[in-house]
A protein has these predicted regions:
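Short, T/G/N/S-enriched strand-turn elements that build extracellular solenoid repeat scaffolds
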Residues: 1-8, 20-28, 40-47, 59-66, ...
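Well-ordered beta-strand segments characteristic of repetitive beta-sheet solenoids
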Residues: 11-20, 28-38, 50-57, 68-74, ...
Length: 189
């Protein structure tokens, strides 16, 4: 399915077993959106007041996704220069690339990934964030921040290499960090 125009409705349900491509001029808008697809490439806007976007495979976003809930279970989530905003964000992937991107949750940000590349990116939660990263977390010039609770761990495997060169990892509440190695000349509070 390829969208280069406007798809809009009060209640919109899009279920597609293949890949959905929403190009730069594409807009998908709804008061309530239920989007379920095998793969998603978004360069435009996917906007909804409520609802869920679920991808089973790869998600590539260079545009804006703003929904109530985002769930992705693919091999890769590439949000380079993209914006993802939701109440809850649940990312299950082998590789999360958020270079110069923004992923923001107003409630819960959950990331379970082998590698997270957040160089010059922002991973933010107004409430809490849990990052389970097994191999590498690269936060050079990036920001990982919450207002309440932040947990970064490698599922107790003692394999995580965390690079926070000129980056910021902070929480106004509690911070829990467990890694095999930490390279930090940034801010960790």
């Amino acid at each position: 399915l390829h969208n280069a125009g406007e798809i809009a409705a009060n209640n919109l349900t899009l279920i597609h077993s293949g890949r959905l491509s929403n190009d730069k001029k594409g807009n998908i808008r709804a008061a309530h959106l239920q989007l379920d697809t095998a793969g998603l490439h978004n360069a435009g806007n996917i906007l909804a007041d409520s609802g869920t976007v679920t991808t089973k495979n790869n998600l590539r976003n260079t545009g804006k996704v703003s929904v109530a809930r985002l769930n992705t279970e693919g091999q890769t989530l590439d949000n380079t220069r993209g914006r993802i905003e939701a109440e809850t964000v649940n990312i299950q992937s082998q590789q999360l690339t958020n270079q110069s991107g923004h992923i923001t949750a107003t409630e819960q940000l959950t990331i379970n990934s082998r590698n997270v590349d957040n160089q010059n990116g922002k991973l933010l939660s107004a409430n809490q964030a849990q990052l389970a990263v097994s191999d590498g977390l690269y936060n050079q010039h990036g920001e990982i921040a919450t207002n309440r609770q932040l947990s970064i761990h490698d599922k107790n495997q003692n394999t995580l290499a965390l690079n926070n060169a000129d980056g910021t990892i902070q929480s106004a509440g509690n911070v829990s960090l467990q890694a095999k190695s930490l390279a930090n000349n940034g801010t960790l509070t």
